[in-house]
Amino acid sequence: MLVLEKAAACGGTTALAEGAVQASGTQWQKEIAGVTDDSAELHKKFWLTDAEGIVKEDLVECMAKNAPDNLKWMADSFNITFSNVFGCYPTPYMKDEYMRDRIHLITDASDETKTGGVVWTTNAQKAVEEKGGEIQTNTEVTDIYQDETGTVVGVAAGKKNYKANKGVVFAMASIDHNEEMSFRYDQQQYWDLKTQFVATAETNTGDGIRIGMAHGADSAFHGAVDLILQTWSYTNNQNPEIPYILIDQRGNRFVREDTTYAFHCRAMFNAAMAQGGIDGCTYMLMDSKMTTADAKCAWSDNAKDGAKAREAALADGSMVQADTLEGLAEKLGMSGTNLKATVDAWNAACAAGEDAAYGRKVQLTALDTAPYYAWKTQNTNIGSIGGLIIDTDARILDVDGNPIPHLYGGGVNTAGWLGPYYPGSGTCLQGALNWGRIAGASAAASK
């Protein structure tokens, strides 16, 4: 086996990630989280619900069914264990019965102080090389070769061509840093590139997708994987959450805030576009309780250099502060009457213990203590959603739905299994595991 890696080192965005992988019914889920009533069927229904009808059910079913065995294979093959299991937050239409703690944190089995995606990429590279696999870094694949039957027989990489005896597997990430492709196919990703912050590996430019489409492969693009990094809001159910509401440029709430992070970030994108186009924005509205919030809030006095970060945000204008809501609204260029009405309604909901407007359940905490703060939200993008359509054998399909012979796809340069927003941490790494493993097996079995 030959691995051609574009970057100077292997790992990509996976090596930068926290190392979360979703699965149901594992030994770790039972032992660590105490969850004994989960199943692949419930996991499938969870993923399908958040997909909003724009995934291929057979792909989602394949992932959910294989997920527990994929984790066991990962542990057995790469000296990995899982030191924590936690859950994600729901969406407004998610049924409680589909929710379970399924997110497994990757940990080195020999040294449990080592966690994260880098453990997997490091240990996997070692295992590949020990089994005789060859890895070439700083080698960018620029095209594929097909014979007269359309079968993929090799790749071009710089001045060299490589023959593929069994097939080619694309595992080349999505269009995260490709502004041209984002402009064409993924408005939310384009907005993130132009106005927000994209934190993925710089080499993620959708090379496999571009090459595949040039050779007739089908594709689908939907949105982005966004989160609010400054507060880690609703990224997992073990994190403490800070009191705030999200408001648009008119001072209105527009989403249930305690939803899984990519869901409310998609709503932030839509609200910004609806009122300001590409220059639009939303705000996180807080009161003085923010300054004493948990250390995961970047501006809290409890965070490392939190007070300095707050001062810097106030100095650069990304955050504004006022002693009254009307004064805050004036600084934001919105109606003070409307902003006060929004906060009054929120505080009344907190007093009643019910958010009748949006159904929020977590941190029903009044915003009633001056000074008040509004932070112009910034999404941190950890990946785009879009790629080449595959089948359950990880074969890349052409626009007529037929497999392109000897061309396979793994990870997030494939599509059909992720919907319009990210359904919670650990989905992408399970996708990398599942489709990469299947793609390798399919290529090995090809004739």
Question: Where are the model-predicted features located?
Answer:
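Glycine-rich FAD pyrophosphate-binding loop
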Residues: 1-16
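A glycine-rich dinucleotide-binding beta-alpha-beta segment and adjacent secondary-structure elements
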Residues: 143, 338-421
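N-terminal glycine-rich dinucleotide-binding loop that anchors FAD/FMN and/or NAD(P) in oxidoreductases
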Residues: 16-45, 339
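Core beta-strand elements of the Rossmann-like FAD/NAD(P) dinucleotide-binding domain
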Residues: 136, 158-167, 402-404
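An anion/pyrophosphate-binding glycine-rich loop and adjacent beta-alpha core
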Residues: 209-211, 215-334
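Rossmann-like flavin
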Residues: 36-96, 320-338
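Conserved redox-cofactor binding core of oxidoreductases
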Residues: 62-159, 179-180, 350-369
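Glycine-rich loop(s) and the adjacent beta-strand/alpha-helix scaffold that form part
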Residues: 163-230, 438
